[in-house]
Amino acid sequence: MDELPYEIWIQIIDLLENPFNMLVSNKYTLSMTKYLKNINSFFMIFVEQGNLSWVKILHSQGYDIRFQNNEALKIACKYGYLEIVKYLYDHGCDIFIDNNFCLKIASERGHLEIVKYLYQNGYKFSNDSKPILDIAAANGHFEIIKYVRLLNPNNINKNGCIRMCWKIDNYDISIISYYYTDNKFKDNIYRATEYGNIEIIKKTWNKFCGNITVSNNLFKIAVVYGHLNIIKYMFKKGHRFPRQSNELIQIACGKGYLDIVKYLHKKGFSIVDSLLNIAGRFGHHDVVEYLYKRLKNVNLQKVITITIENDYLEIVKFFVTKENNPDEIRTYLILAHKHGHNRIIRYFDSLLIMTQQKLQSNLEN
């Protein structure tokens, strides 16, 4: 195998649709990766897939990971691949590239661990942090607002709570205001709920359980931060949030809290189409599957459009399979091209090829 000239092997490799299994067969073929015509495309695909092993392999063979203005780092931040972000940063990629794009896209997509990593490795809270807060707010990411706000060195109320007001439509959640509160009585129980400290809730329950406004606020906070144990405790103690309001189950769907969605549904909260749209908008596959099984006559085109626009490939695959309508593939492909979502573009391209091959086969038979 080693006796064939490079030129012959390169021609063979370029003819293969996926040459990588062969390339890793020995050191000789691995050394040819640098000569691949499509190495840039392959590298970006591996980053989009979260394949750290191949990112390391191609880098070890001389690939410039900062190619196209640190595009690989931007992609990793977008899709939440923390280990790839760490690797690229450790090997020279610039996390401040393009006016803090990495922090902005991670905040937009709700990747809290990447936001934390970026701040821990050079970002500082400043006036420049307001756009980050606004981006997180516009996309309903409570936990990022909380984290970034508490970085403010001028905040004298480090032990206070951040209260948020939000709005919800039939597929989106956004935060319209966020501010500190420092009422000692309320702040203690609000903060305890925010951080999931159920023991304080239990000890102080009799003090506030008769105050409907406070109880409702605590219930909302428990849902926002995913504290199912507090939600269960409040139900057990007789607290009842109005069933006609779907606000809380909408928040749970938007945050991806499947256990809370199930529990609220069990307690009488309705499952409606808008919940599916919200779960799809924020990329929560397990919640999407749970809701879909409990709905009838779902408007699949609507939710597929939402998930394409927001670049959640696995959910797109799930719904396209359920829809099973080849006539819509080109429409969806155009939408994916419009938003520049390469993973979804490749998926619909492959579906078109399969459809054309099936038609050709039927004609021949």
Swiss-Prot record:
**UniProt superkingdom:** Viruses
- Name the Pfam families on file: Ank_2, Ank_4
Keyword Transferase carried by entry: no
User: Would the keyword Repeat turn up in this protein's UniProt record?
Assistant: yes
Q: Which UniProt keywords apply?
A: ANK repeat, Repeat
Q: Which SMART domains match?
A: ANK
Please report the residue spans annotated as repeat (ANK): 38-67, 68-97, 99-127, 129-158, 184-213, 214-243, 245-273, 275-298, 299-328, 330-361
InterPro entries according to UniProt: Ankyrin_rpt, Ankyrin_rpt-contain_sf
Q: Which PANTHER family match?
A: ANKYRIN REPEAT AND PROTEIN KINASE DOMAIN-CONTAINING PROTEIN, ANKYRIN REPEAT-CONTAINING PROTEIN-RELATED
**What name is this protein filed under?**
Putative ankyrin repeat protein R903
Species of origin reads Acanthamoeba polyphaga mimivirus (APMV)
Q: What is the lineage of its organism?
A: Viruses, Varidnaviria, Bamfordvirae, Nucleocytoviricota, Megaviricetes
